[in-house]
Amino acid sequence: MKTRPKKAGQQKKTESKAIDSLDKKLGGPNRPST
């Protein structure tokens, strides 16, 4: 059960990193709320 929240946090970090890369590709600071 302790590893569950850790995995969720890691997924969120990877998600924002991917969104960051998308932002740079689009050339704008508009981030999707998803």
Curated annotation (Swiss-Prot):
State the source organism's domain of life.
Bacteria
- List the biased-composition ranges (Basic residues): 1-10
Q: What is this protein called?
A: Small, acid-soluble spore protein M
GO term, biological process aspect, one: sporulation resulting in formation of a cellular spore
Q: What are the record keywords, sorted?
A: Sporulation
What induces or represses expression of this protein, per its UniProt record?
Expression is sigma G-dependent.
Basic and acidic residues bias: start-end ranges: 12-26
Q: Does the keyword DNA repair apply?
A: no
Primary subcellular site in the record, as a coarse category: other
Entry annotated with the keyword Metal-binding:
no
The protein's location, in the record's own words, is: Spore core
Segments carrying the region annotation (Disordered) are 1-34
